[in-house]
C-alpha cells in the first residue's frame, strides 16, 4: 500500500493543440489536489509540437514551481509524450491526464483510493462499470470498437478489464519504469496494459 501522507504524485499532461483547454485543465488539477490534500505533487506537461498557440501559453507559465514543461521538436504522438514525461518524473504514483477536459480531475481521490487501501499497482478509470451516479453515453461505434479491443486484449493477458482505452490510467511509477515502452501513438494504451499484465502487476478499475 501507498502511504497517503508521504507519497508524491506525478500528473502527466500530454498535449497537442490544446490552447483552449490547457490552462483550464492545469487549474482543475490544482483544485483537485488542494481539495484532497495531495500537497506533494508535480505537474509534468509535454507539448507535442503544437501549432495553435499552446506552446506560447505554456511558456508563460514555465516559472510556476509545481510545473515542469517539455517541448517536442516534432509531433510524435501521445505514447512518445508519455515516454518523455517518464524520463523526468520523481513521483511514487503517476496519473495520465488528458488535456482536453474529457476526464475530470475531481476523480483523483477515487482513482487513488485503491493504492491507499490495497496492494494495487495500476488503476484504470472505467467509463462502463457505472460506479457513480451517472455514466456518460458514448458514440456507438467507438464504444463497440473499444469493447472489441478490450475483449481481445483480455484474452491475451488473462484479465477482465472493461475499458482498456480509458484516458484515465494511474500507475505506481516503479511498475511503469519496469517496462520498456516503444509505441509513439495511441497504441500506447494496449502496449502498456499488455506489458504490465505480463509482469503480473495488480490491476484495479474504478
Annotate each predicted stretch with a short phrase.
Residues 13, 26, 30, 37-49, ...:
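Short beta-strand/loop segment that forms part of the nucleotide-sugar
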Residues 72-88, 93, 105-186:
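Acceptor/aglycone-binding surface of glycosyltransferases and processive sugar-polymer synthases
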Residues 1-31:
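N-proximal low-complexity "stem/linker" segments adjacent to membrane-targeting elements
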Residues 47-56, 101:
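A conserved acidic beta->alpha catalytic loop
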Residues 39-44, 55-88:
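Conserved donor nucleotide-binding strand/loop of the catalytic core
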Residues 8-10, 42, 191:
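Cell-envelope/extracellular polymer assembly enzymes that use nucleotide-activated donors
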Residues 20-24, 52-60:
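Acidic helix N-cap motif at the loop->helix transition within catalytic regions
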Amino acid at each position: 500500500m501507498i502511504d497517503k501522507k508521504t507519497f508524491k504524485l506525478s500528473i502527466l499532461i500530454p498535449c497537442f493543440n490544446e490552447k483552449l483547454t490547457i490552462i483550464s485543465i492545469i487549474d482543475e488539477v490544482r483544485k483537485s489536489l488542494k481539495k484532497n490534500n495531495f500537497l506533494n505533487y508535480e505537474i509534468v506537461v509535454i507539448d507535442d509540437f503544437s501549432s495553435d498557440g499552446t506552446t506560447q501559453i505554456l511558456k508563460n507559465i514555465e516559472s510556476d514551481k509545481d510545473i515542469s514543461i517539455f517541448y517536442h521538436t516534432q509531433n510524435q504522438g501521445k505514447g512518445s509524450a508519455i515516454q518523455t514525461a517518464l524520463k523526468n518524473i520523481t513521483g511514487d504514483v503517476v496519473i495520465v491526464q488528458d488535456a482536453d477536459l474529457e476526464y475530470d480531475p475531481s476523480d483523483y481521490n477515487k482513482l487513488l483510493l485503491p493504492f491507499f487501501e490495497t496492494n494495487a499497482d495500476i488503476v484504470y478509470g472505467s467509463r462502463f462499470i457505472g460506479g457513480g451516479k451517472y455514466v456518460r453515453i458514448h458514440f456507438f461505434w467507438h464504444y463497440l470498437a473499444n469493447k472489441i479491443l478490450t475483449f481481445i486484449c483480455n484474452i491475451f493477458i488473462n484479465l477482465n478489464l472493461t475499458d482498456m482505452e480509458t484516458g484515465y490510467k494511474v500507475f505506481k511509477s516503479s511498475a511503469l519504469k519496469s517496462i520498456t515502452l516503444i509505441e509513439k501513438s495511441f497504441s500506447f494504451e494496449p502496449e502498456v496494459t499488455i506489458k504490465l499484465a505480463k509482469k503480473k502487476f495488480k490491476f484495479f478499475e474504478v
